[in-house]
Amino acid sequence: MKAEILCVGTELLLGDIVNTNAQYISKELANIGIEVYHHSVIGDNENRLLKELERAFNYCDLVITTGGLGPTKDDLTKESVAKFFQEDLVLHEKSLKQIEKRLSCFNKSMTESNRKQAYFPKNCEILENPNGTAPGFIIEKDNKIAIILPGPPYEMQPMFENKVIPYLEKLTNSTIKSKVLRITGIGESDVADLISDILESQTNPTVAPYAKQGETTLRITAKANSEEKALSLIVPIEKKIRQILGDNIYGSGETLLEEVVANILVKRNLTIATAESCTGGLLAGKLINFPGISSVFLEGAITYSNESKINRLNVKKETLEKYTAVSKEVALEMAEGIAKSAGTNIGISTTGVAGPGGGTYDKPIGLIYIGLYINGKTFVEELNYSGNRQFIRNITVTRALDFLRRNLE
């Protein structure tokens, strides 16, 4: 089955709203083995939407739309789809009552504009919306399937998960299961080179690498006539990949790197404090996202100036004068200083040149040092990155977390 995603809304074209719906739907369709061939964004215009539907159905069996189901006059998706399938719009009494009930929860009464949201093509399957006033629907005709969903993600995603996926799984006549491996420390091209034999010989399961900032994910997808069989096909491929990539794999599924690190700290009861310069608190922020981290995370200090490094972390003035703030020597003294002042097992530090200014020939923009102190032992890592200030700061945090993980495992 081939699919296209049409996201409707002039606000998307103007850049007022980020289109996360296409990403979410594409990912979910890939999980059940449906190929997405095209994404389109269309303004609130009936003629353009009709043309897009005609173009999409020339090569796709399935078109999924999001947006344009609201109560205003420029919400035209439903009308356009009904016209394309040559269906009349009729009032659906059950939906009308549900919309009225939802409005009453907010002390609002039914208006003619809201009443419009209860009209649907005569021959369609209506998808209830417990999170809003815009139900979706599925319409099938002449081997064409259109699935029409609301635009707000908090309405669309539950509808897609609870209604659309079960509907589509019945059409595929097979079970598709996926497992995601999360990798950091090596880039997508290095991962692809290391597992090239697997990528070149893949059939079922398939293995697909995806690059993200600071990490790579590998999605292993298997198709079979049962869930048990599909999962069993994944096992030997996953084992082979783990043997090749080793500790570059930090987790699987939706696991985050900071979650892995925090779990290690909590399970081993290792207390930690952070001393940050170029990352300005981002590292501490990542760690404290994890529930339960308060039992081991004692302190986070942002020591941006040389004076604060000296006064707060006991970094030696002589070290700063001899090596400058951006140096492995200072990174190590920062890590040890925060650990000793906070009384923790671990101290971790970041210092570097994030840009856009401040770089020199000897200390260019993107030069970063991560210092680590663990129960009397010290470690340091030097990094060199190119990119804008935010990228360099974010990648430094990822590398710091991974540096800590590898030295704890």
Swiss-Prot record:
SMART domains linked to this entry: MoCF_biosynth
Top-level taxon: Bacteria
Signal peptide: none
Family designation: Belongs to the CinA family.
PANTHER family: NICOTINAMIDE-NUCLEOTIDE AMIDOHYDROLASE PNCC (PTHR13939), NMN AMIDOHYDROLASE-LIKE PROTEIN YFAY (PTHR13939:SF0)
This protein's name: Putative competence-damage inducible protein
